[in-house]
């Protein structure tokens, strides 16, 4: 999934990660849990709670966590996902967000600077509700991410999986997945992260 709008379609052979079903793996109590409160067309849609796989991909998880909490600041203002939109939705595939710079899929930055490397491909896209980094090729991770709506194994070894949606957050994800879309798979109603943080 290219953060600029294209989709990586080539399959890669699966390696590592064993037979773990990452979307239903038992939670690790040491991993951070973050949340998004989401609105659709200005109407509250619910909360998405997410476990970040700091035990598997600590650098990627920390990048996402800090954009949830707003710890990173520029000129005294928090940088992160609050007021960011889900700019790309493809039913039965994924919902994409994280471009708080431009809200159109072209913005890129990380807590480490501009882009950072693919940490590892240990976790796989085994089912719905997995958090994975959007990119424009190898080692181009920034702030954009997507949540899987189904198994997407053709993305394995190309996109870094770093967390998963917990519990009822999947219902909110399904609401986002089912919004009407216009050109470039952009929702016709604004889907906005109204609040975010760490639990």
Curated annotation (Swiss-Prot):
Belongs to the cyclophilin-type PPIase family. This is Peptidyl-prolyl cis-trans isomerase CYP22. InterPro entries: Cyclophilin-like_dom_sf (IPR029000), Cyclophilin-type_PPIase (IPR024936), Cyclophilin-type_PPIase_dom (IPR002130). Ubiquitous. Residues 35-198 form the PPIase cyclophilin-type domain. It comes from Arabidopsis thaliana. One of its GO terms (molecular function) is peptidyl-prolyl cis-trans isomerase activity. One of its GO terms (cellular component) is plant-type vacuole. PPIases accelerate the folding of proteins. It catalyzes the cis-trans isomerization of proline imidic peptide bonds in oligopeptides. It catalyses: [protein]-peptidylproline (omega=180) = [protein]-peptidylproline (omega=0). Its EC number is 5.2.1.8. SUPFAM superfamilies: Cyclophilin-like (SSF50891). The keyword Transferase does not apply. Keywords: Chaperone, Isomerase, Rotamase.
């Amino acid at each position: 999934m290219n953060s600029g709008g294209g989709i990586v379609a080539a399959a890669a052979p699966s390696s590592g990660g064993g037979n773990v079903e990452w979307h239903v793996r038992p939670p690790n109590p040491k991993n951070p849990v973050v949340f998004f409160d989401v609105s659709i067309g200005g109407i509250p849609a619910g909360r998405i709670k997410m476990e970040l796989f700091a035990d598997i991909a600590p650098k990627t998880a920390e990048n996402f966590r800090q954009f949830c909490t707003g710890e990173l600041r520029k000129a005294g203002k928090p940088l992160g996902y609050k007021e960011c939109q889900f700019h790309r939705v493809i039913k039965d595939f994924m919902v994409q967000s994280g471009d708080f710079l431009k809200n159109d899929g072209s913005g890129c930055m990380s807590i480490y600077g501009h882009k950072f490397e693919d940490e590892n491909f240990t976790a796989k896209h085994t089912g719905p509700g997995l958090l994975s980094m959007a990119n424009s090729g190898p080692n181009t991770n920034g702030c954009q991410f997507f949540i899987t709506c189904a198994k997407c194994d053709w993305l394995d070894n190309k996109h870094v999986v770093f967390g998963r949606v917990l519990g009822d957050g999947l219902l909110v994800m399904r609401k986002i997945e089912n919004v009407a879309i216009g050109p470039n798979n952009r929702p016709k109603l604004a889907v906005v992260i109204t609040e975010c943080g760490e639990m």
